């Protein structure tokens, strides 16, 4: 084991950057967080500044070290987890971004996706990548960038431009530009990776007109990709040794190591994943087949079924920033609890289209059932219920695809702290919901992958031992009431 005893988890999310420092018992000893700017240049467009993301990462690393009372030399390894699908281009030599990154929520390529579907390519895309043709994924974003950024394609064809999702950008910056890599979990979200070979697909790359020379090397989720160089708060030579997309890292952090084990993360969006073992399970119910992780460079690959809802916590942020009915996101729980029900108001959180299992990019958010008795409290409660009802749809699709029931539902992410939301989720699912003590399971998963890659741990069993439940929510709703909620929800979704 290295002399240093701590692992740093860099968790780069959609609205901000978290850094956590954990000891070898997986206890958090220091943490920090910093929001960064969301750019909305046009309706349905969402962008991030790559340089601002990196600046927030360096700031958070310094603050987390300070909060832990540690120095950079105390860090034995770094693990990364990240918002997936968000797409960036930068110059290979200088690291200068060619533009803002296009965020996973961005819908600007909806027309391009419609044309691809009309060409009849979606069945083949599903077969090769496990994904659907949707603006959500990196591939069409990358095509758009090459079509609209002057000179970008020619530079990429010469090998002068790097493409990367956020994990790739962070490793590039951490290693002083030495490593241009991604891991299998992030690569599986691009529309460009073959799920079977775990390599870039020439067929998909040709379909999307993506130059091969810009693509990063695909690696495992727990191995050394490079070492730190030129950092402000960390010495040179610390191994960057683990990475996974945020939802896969959360599945790992929730100790879902056996086929059939599942979790749902409530963050900006909400994402339900089920471990399906060493073979990919193809979906016929509108879900995605994705890579969960591969431990080591040549280890066994674990796959997952995923249901992705684009808007969860983001709906609460919209209530705060757009409608201005609350001052802080946590305030929504007290407002919603001030009424006994939603007053028959239903909210469909299609603020960025509808994701799985519907896949309707043209859908828009909807409040249904409003009358003169409706108050902002009813609307707040409907927002929380809408988040839970969309997860019910994902869980039903997952049961059909996997042939497995979900006997216990593990929840994590920031919005999982909301007791009203968690109770309603258990009610509409009709199964117990378990919330862990550590809600930031993405960071836990990233830290453990980094520690595995650097040799601090030699198996995932330590994370299973470290996992502890904080509270179990048992369903209380009567079946007939549940069916009424679901019927109203179904009608509202059809109108969205």
UniProtKB/Swiss-Prot annotation:
Function: Key enzyme in the regulation of glycerol uptake and metabolism. Catalyzes the phosphorylation of glycerol to yield sn-glycerol 3-phosphate.
GO term, biological process aspect, one: glycerol catabolic process
One function term, GO molecular function aspect: ATP binding
Keyword tags: ATP-binding, Glycerol metabolism, Kinase, Nucleotide-binding, Transferase
Entry's EC annotation: 2.7.1.30
Catalytic reaction equation(s): glycerol + ATP = sn-glycerol 3-phosphate + ADP + H(+)
SUPFAM superfamilies per UniProt: Actin-like ATPase domain
Family classification: Belongs to the FGGY kinase family.
CDD domains: FGGY_EcGK_like
Entries under Gene3D superfamilies matching the protein: 3.30.420.40
Binding of glycerol, residues: 84-85, 136, 246-247
Regulation: Inhibited by fructose 1,6-bisphosphate (FBP).
UniProt key word ATP-binding: yes
Enzyme class: transferase
Residues engaged in binding ADP: 14, 268, 313, 414, 418
Binding residues for ATP: 14-15, 268, 313, 317, 414
Gene field: glpK
Name of the protein described by the UniProt record: Glycerol kinase
A single Gene Ontology CC term: cytosol
Binding site residues for sn-glycerol 3-phosphate: 14, 84-85, 136, 246
Entry-linked Pfam families: FGGY_C (PF02782), FGGY_N (PF00370)
InterPro entries: ATPase_NBD, Carb_kinase_FGGY, Carb_kinase_FGGY_CS, FGGY_C, FGGY_N, Glycerol_kin
Domain of life: Bacteria
Pathway where this protein functions: Polyol metabolism; glycerol degradation via glycerol kinase pathway; sn-glycerol 3-phosphate from glycerol: step 1/1
